[in-house]
Regions:
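A short, conserved beta-to-alpha structural element at the edge of catalytic cores
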Residues: 76-102
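Conserved, mostly hydrophobic/aromatic
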Residues: 26, 58, 72, 81, ...
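Hydrophobic faces of well-ordered beta-strands that scaffold small-molecule active sites
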Residues: 33, 55-57, 79-81
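Short catalytic/ligand-binding loop motif for oxyanion handling, primarily in non-cytosolic enzymes
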Residues: 2-5, 41-42, 63-65, 88-93
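Extended, charge-rich helix/loop segments that form flexible
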Residues: 93-177
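Acidic/histidine-rich helix-loop elements
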Residues: 2-14
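Membrane-embedded segments
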Residues: 56, 60-69
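C-terminal domain-boundary segment and adjacent tail
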Residues: 11-47
Length: 177
């Protein structure tokens, strides 16, 4: 989508113009194949062409249908779209998407880190948690794409804490933001 003019410009995604450039680059430099070609190649032990690319899209967002599909259709390209079963069968927003929304809904990531500090302190005895500083030192490592605070928030809420606590905290923050 056109990120800067979208409803949630701070939700991480690929801007539509950059996606178009990527597709044009792949069309020029690679052989974009279909899922049927991959299956045929496996079933018949036939090599796929060199520099082959299979286009795949995780999460099956409406953005994919509204923005990606028309571009692929224009060039007669196929993409494989993978919808998360939990979101469909349970009619729920995935925690990873809630976390993206929370991060996009506040510019003050330090305030969000401080909220997490209070929540860790609140649940510390019940869940036998380490002190907050332990988690921050362990997880807050800046990456190429995210600041150390954003990485900390993502890692704490996606993997570090036990699942039921992660869900409680994510739901609390999602409701707030």
């Amino acid at each position: 989508r056109d990120l800067k003019n979208s409803r949630y410009p701070d939700i991480k995604g690929l801007d539509i113009n950059l996606f178009k450039k990527q597709i044009n680059y792949m069309r020029k430099h690679y052989h974009i194949i279909t899922m049927e070609e991959v299956i045929y190649s496996i079933d018949n032990q036939v090599k796929i062409p060199e520099k082959s690319v299979l286009l795949t899209f995780d999460d099956a967002y409406s953005d994919h249908y509204n923005n990606v599909f028309p571009i692929l259709d224009k060039y007669k390209l196929q993409g494989s779209f993978y919808a998360p079963s939990k979101a469909i069968t349970e009619h729920t927003v995935l925690d990873v998407n809630k976390i993206h929304f929370i991060l996009a809904s506040t510019e003050d990531k330090i305030n969000l880190v401080n909220e997490l500090k209070e929540l860790v302190k609140f649940y510390q005895k019940e869940y036998q948690l380490e002190d907050f500083d332990y988690y921050y030192k362990k997880l807050a490592q800046a990456s190429r794409l995210d600041t150390k605070d954003v990485i900390f928030i993502k890692r704490l809420l996606q993997v570090e804490l036990v699942e039921d606590l992660r869900i409680k905290i994510v739901d609390t923050l999602f409701e707030k933001y």
